[in-house]
């Protein structure tokens, strides 16, 4: 008989396991990764943040890194150029879901092309990290919002991640276009994301993979 999730978590806390140690014990015991981290703050603090900043600064394409609760950790100048005054938001998902600048100007066709996917990401992140207060606040704020709330409640879209998605975007300096999203996860920060946006103007042929 395999041990239960709550038993393994109690053992992990008593022994003060690191997240990597807990994941290994969980895999050996149950044959799968834990559905959410042992420490609710895991993925919030990124130990390699400085290295990621150097990495994204050297990229030509729009690039940024956010943590498990979508706080912006690192970004390059092409990413900053998307925003008013060249100042990106502190939390990328809160901006995409709730900011007028995003919904009315930058994220073209927000209600149909952007909202269903990003709101489901918020829902799933809150379920996966139930003790994360920032995600709980974001989830609650989205449900209360007069535009995002109804979409959140009626959405039935199965959507886990945006990797490979192509979406319309209005670039303040370049004009209307579309982005292809390339997403990966920093190994030392489960749930964090490294995002690259490949931007193509509407009158240009999209970059081949």
Q: What is the predicted function of each stretch?
A:
Residues 3-44:
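Short amphipathic recognition helices of helix-turn-helix/homeodomain-type DNA-binding modules
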Residues 3, 11, 49, 58, ...:
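Residue-level detector of functional hotspots within protein domains
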Residues 154-209:
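Low-complexity, glycine/alanine/valine/leucine- and proline-rich hydrophobic stretches
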Residues 3, 39-42, 46-50, 91, ...:
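Alpha-helix initiation/capping motif
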Residues 4-6, 42-44, 74, 146-148, ...:
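A short linear-motif detector with a strong N-terminal bias
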Residues 33-69, 74:
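Short N-terminal edge-element motif at the start of the domain
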Residues 59-61, 66-162, 198-203:
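PAS-family sensory domains
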Residues 34-38, 43-45, 139-141, 155, ...:
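N-terminal start-of-chain detector that recognizes signal peptides
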């Amino acid at each position: 008989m395999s041990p239960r999730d709550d038993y393994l978590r109690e053992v992990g806390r008593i022994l003060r396991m690191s997240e990597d140690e807990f994941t290994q014990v969980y895999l050996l015991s149950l044959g799968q990764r834990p559905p959410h981290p042992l420490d609710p703050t895991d993925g919030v603090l990124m130990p390699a943040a400085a290295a990621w900043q150097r990495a994204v600064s050297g990229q030509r394409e729009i690039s940024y890194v956010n943590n498990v609760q979508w706080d912006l950790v690192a970004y390059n100048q092409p990413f900053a150029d998307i925003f008013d005054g060249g100042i990106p938001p502190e939390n990328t998902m809160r901006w995409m879901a709730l900011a007028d600048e995003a919904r009315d100007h930058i994220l073209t066709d927000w209600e149909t092309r952007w909202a269903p996917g990003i709101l489901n990401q918020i829902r799933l992140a809150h379920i996966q990290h139930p003790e994360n207060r920032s995600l709980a606040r974001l989830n609650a704020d989205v449900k209360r919002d007069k535009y995002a709330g109804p979409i959140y409640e009626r959405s039935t879209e199965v959507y886990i991640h945006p990797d490979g998605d192509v979406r319309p975007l209005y670039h303040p300096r370049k004009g209307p276009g579309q982005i292809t999203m390339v997403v990966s996860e920093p190994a030392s920060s489960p749930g964090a994301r490294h995002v690259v946006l490949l931007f193509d103007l509407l009158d240009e042929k999209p970059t081949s993979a």
